[in-house]
Amino acid sequence: MNDIFGNNNGYRVPKLPFFYYIRNIMDIQLKQGCKYALLVPTSMGLRVTPESGQPIHSSDILHLQATSAETNVASISSYLGLPVKVLTTFVEGSPFAAFIKSNLRARGMDFEGADVPQGGPWGYRHQINVADSGYGSRGPRVWNDRAGEVGRTLNAKDFDLDRIFGKEGVQIVHLSGLIGALSPDTTKFCLDIARAAKKYGTRISFDLNYRASFWKGREQELHDAFSEICSIADILIGNEEDFQLCLGIEGPEAGGKDIASKINGFKDMIGRVKAQYPNAQVYATTLRQVNNTNSHNWGAIMLEGENWHVVELREIHVLDRIGGGDGFVGGLLYAILKGWEPEKWIQFGWASGALATTFLTDYAQPADEEQVWSIWAGNARVKR
């Protein structure tokens, strides 16, 4: 296994040993004596994709995957050997719950969560994400089917947060705005986790991940909750739409062309975020300009302390774009956990995001660090 210091002992899937160390990374001091490098709360679901990039309505062969944005992020660390834990909930006795648990084990992740009784055929279930990856001039389409989603019941009372953060220990907890906005219960769940993390010295990463349908009718409530999390977060991530619609912070027009010419506008936006939420040590956003479904220009901006780091937009070839942003966050967090210099945080994040778009799953499955760095270097030569 790869231990926390990156030594390879012949196995990919970690057995989650305790490790004892402390690192000062610029202003980010990671907690010592922790069992887990990374913790992610999430609502696990199913991703259904047609074969060969075909549209749903014309397909009769569908592939089933286990999915969530938060485990997409955590997969970079787990595949590269760091100990990861997932907090979630399952439908009791469901074959899909068994499928999800098997997938998390295969990714090298510990998981913990209640098995909730289904309550009959019209009761709880795991959410379904139907994804048409698109091709060429035909753009991707995603259909979310979340009726009866068991993850909406996530509640801090189902977990011993004092044990998880105090006795076991966690270096970084990654929170997503998807879970934060999923239901009133999950909003409180994320707040409780953030407060417990702060109490025990765990660093907090927060990706705003705005979804209009989740926010409808709850705008003020969610703005207040997200603002509290942002006020104690150590790492803040979001795109121009996230910062504007979640926090009311002005930024560049969402989407559009010629993103490269707007980099100063993105920097100004991040500066306003920092002024409003000065506790964080790292602020990051990705840049994406879509040429066609299979060709994107991909970049990133990061502010750590007073230092700007910019990855200028570069063309990447895309098999499936879903999960690229999660891959960026996962690579960024992995680089921070490894104690690398800040310049490498954004580089590894950019390359991990690019790697994720080459997989049919919506999460990257890096073979090793070298594979990720080869993407950064633009080297796609055969490795023998």
Predicted segments, located by residue:
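Histidine-anchored nucleotide/phosphate-binding helix
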Residues: 69-79, 190-196
